Amino acid sequence: MHRALVTGAGKRLGRAMALYLAGRGFDVAVHYATSRAAAEETASDIIAQGQRTSLLQANLLDEAETQALLPRAAAALGGPITCLVNNASIFEADNIHTATAESWERHIGSNLRAPFVLTQAMAAQGLQATSDNRSEPRATGLIVNMIDQRVLNLTPEFMSYTIAKMGLWAMTRTTAQALAPAIRVNGIGPGPTLQGQHQTEEVFAQERRDTVLERGVNLEDITATLGYFLDAPAITGQLICPDGGEHLKW
């Protein structure tokens, strides 16, 4: 039985990945922080695809709630979680002059600490590798961390966020080493996919045009990358950036 937990699954990329996983035969636990109505819609669409789901509210800046989330998901879906998507994220502007202790803690907490705690919980389930038709180990677990193309193209803006995502990229590789062969760990580094809350349509359209390929990213690009990770048992510790080549800008 395939069971997934997607954090921040009520809206945007999280919703798209949750629905994609349901389409691939996963029962999906839908995590949300405050967007209950959106999460309920995601859950309803998962049920419409014939899969089980559960709505799970948790503040991922709260250590106890974060530690409890994956075990709650496993209990709700009736067995171990085999796919964890660490998608929930805080993305707020700061720089070397404006960053505060609070902005630092919020970004590190949501983008690095919470994924680490959830990864520990995934590991604690005791998943074991199976054997494929070559009698070689095949991982039964997959963790996908939503990172950001900017870790390959650093700028001094969004500093706390960027540092947290750099940590998540390092964590992706080190946990891939630590959890093999039972669990694979990979990252997706999106480029301009959906208009930001504080962006105008014109600014977002220009951001998409400014990539190397002169095009942005669609939700299908993100879910295709997730699908590749599901289907590629020899891939771990990798970052794929569906970003129109934004990370190559100079």
List the model feature ranges, each with a label.
Residues 218-242, 247-248:
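C-terminal substrate-recognition "lid" of short-chain dehydrogenase/reductases
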Residues 87-92, 245:
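Conserved NAD(P)H cofactor-binding loop of Rossmann-fold oxidoreductase domains
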Residues 24-40:
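Conserved glycine-rich Rossmann-like NAD(P)H-binding loop of the short-chain dehydrogenase/reductase
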Residues 180-184, 236-237:
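Short, small/polar-rich loop/turn modules that mediate ligand/substrate recognition or access, typified
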Residues 130-180, 192:
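Catalytic loop of short-chain dehydrogenase/reductase
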Residues 95-96, 100-108, 207:
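Substrate-binding pocket helix/loop in short-chain dehydrogenase/reductase
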Residues 10-12:
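Conserved glycine-rich cofactor-binding loop
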